C-alpha cells in the first residue's frame, strides 16, 4: 500500500481505502504476534506510466501524515523514509537515489537501510 495506490496501478486512488489497507495489515500482524514497524511512502513527483496524475506529491504527503499519526496513536514505530529521500523541493525522490523517479537505486537503499535497522533493533 502506498506508491502503487497513488499511481492508480489497480484502482482510482482513495486515501481512506489505502490507509484502511495499512491498518488491516497492522491488525493482522498484531493478531499473529508479529511486531510492526510502519514507514512513510517514498516521494514521487510523477509516474512515467501515469503522467495524467499531476498531484502525486500532495497525495503522498497527505498519506504519510496519516500513516505517521496512526503509528503514533497506536505506539507503532515509524520510519520516515520520505524526509531521508526527498529532493530539495520536497516533492520528488532525490535524483541521487533513483533512475526513474519512483524506485530507489542501490544508493537509495543504502540511505534507507540504517533507518530500518535502527527501528528493528529498537523494536526487538
Provide a role label for each language-model segment.
Residues 43-124:
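Catalytic His-Asp segment of secreted/periplasmic serine-dependent ester chemistry enzymes
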Amino acid at each position: 500500500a502506498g506508491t502503487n495506490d497513488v499511481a492508480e496501478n489497480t484502482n482510482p486512488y482513495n486515501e481512506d481505502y489505502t490507509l484502511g489497507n495499512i491498518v488491516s495489515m497492522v491488525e493482522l500482524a498484531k493478531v499473529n504476534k508479529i511486531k510492526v514497524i510502519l514507514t512513510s511512502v517514498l516521494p514521487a513527483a510523477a509516474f512515467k506510466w501515469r503522467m495524467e496524475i499531476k498531484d502525486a506529491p500532495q497525495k503522498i504527503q497527505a498519506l504519510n501524515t496519516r500513516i505517521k499519526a496512526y503509528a503514533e496513536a497506536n505506539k507503532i514505530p515509524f520510519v520516515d523514509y520520505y524526509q531521508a529521500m526527498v529532493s530539495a523541493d520536497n516533492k520528488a525522490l532525490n535524483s541521487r537515489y533513483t533512475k526513474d523517479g519512483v524506485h530507489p537505486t542501490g544508493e537509495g537503499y543504502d540511505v534507507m537501510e540504517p533507518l530500518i535497522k535502527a527501528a528493528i533493533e529498537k523494536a526487538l
